[in-house]
Amino acid sequence: MAYALRYHPEVAEEDLPDIPVNLRQRLARSIEARLTTRPEHYGTPLRGSLKGYWKLRVGDYRVVFKLAGTEVRVLAILHRKTVYEAVTRRLG
């Protein structure tokens, strides 16, 4: 089953510009290869206040996403030290 990707507006505006180009390409390849095919296999479910969300580890970066039917909603692509705080803020 193929999954469609949808990105939170802040991913393009805030997250991606701060990531070096070579890492951006690596992240794009991982997201495209893993999250569009088997996100529940490659991702790890989050716990606590972020229960219902998943993470994909790509080096020191984390891609936080939510599964909604055949859609993968990407909330953040940030360094592991700041990603969970940013996701909590984006969720309001």
Q: Which residue ranges define each predicted feature?
A:
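Enriched for short, Lys/Arg-rich terminal
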Residues: 2-6, 25, 58, 66-92
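Alpha-helix boundary/capping and short turn/kink residues
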Residues: 20-24, 40, 77
